[in-house]
Structures are given as C-alpha cells and as structure tokens.
C-alpha cells in the first residue's frame, strides 16, 4: 500500500531547485506552506477556465480529472486539466514562452504513467491573456467581460520521447531528499491519508 504522495508540482519544484539553486523555495513546497498566488498563477487559472469553455478541440472533454497510481511506497497523484479521446490536455499561461519549454515538465511522465491508455499529452500554451471588464450600457451595475488572447502554442509529447522513466525520476528524487536530509520532512508532510 502506498505511503507517500508524489505530485507533478512537487517534482517540478524539486527540478527547479536543482537547476536554479532555490533550496529555500523547495523546502516551502516540501512543508506545504501556504502562499499568495502570483499574478501569473491567477492568469493561469483564468486561462484554464476560458479554454474549458471556448477551445474547440477540448470542448466536451472531461475536466479536472483526478488520477492516481500506486508505485511502490508512493502514490502518484495529479489533476488533469482535460482528458478527451485518449489525449491529456494541459492549459499553460507563461509570460515568456520558448519552444520546448514544457519538455522537462514531470507532469508529462507522471500523467502518461497514470493514464496508460492516453496516447499523448498536449500542452496548450499562451503568453498573453488579458481579461478586460467594461460597463454594459444596457444595464446599470453590470460589467461585461472580454479577453485579449495571444497565440496558442502547442507542445505534444508521447512517453517514448523521454530518456528517463518515472521510476528513475522517483529514485533520483528519493536519493536527493536523503542526501540533503529532507527525506524525513517529506515522509511527514506528504503521508497518504488513506
């Protein structure tokens, strides 16, 4: 029976720490400290809601799908933005986009492992998303909303594109936590409830 959660956010935060040396920020994630969402995070939520209601390719899909899979002592867990026709979709807002930005996102390997019947994972990305509110001239105290959206970039990945498996990533994560004396904190804070 699985003992500890592993989420894409946790692994991505760890990866960011390794690449950018922000151990303090990773420890906050590891300790599940609350934080105030940044403007970019808030725009990401709004972009996701907009896409669920308006993007033709994903209309009628299953949204906010909770997925999990036991993996030894670990329970891989995530929430898929949209699952439709054997494809996992994830909506991403980022201020600065470069081609291949999400290639190293652990979300891809995790989701394709947890949903083995999915053929691929598709990221639908924009670097411009502005919500514009204006007064509706026909009604007092009612505002109308419009959106100014930039290009929607697309990244598609299949499991066979990656040199590492999720098993390898989890092993490296576990060893790194032990090496930095953080494994005990992890097992305390990320213990499965059930």
Question: What function would you assign to each model-found segment?
Answer:
Residues 169, 174-194:
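Charged phosphate-binding loop/patch that engages nucleotide di/tri-phosphates or the phosphate backbone
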Residues 1-87, 185-194:
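Metal-dependent nuclease catalytic cores that hydrolyze phosphodiester bonds in DNA/RNA
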Residues 65-172, 176:
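Mg2+/Mn2+-dependent nuclease catalytic core
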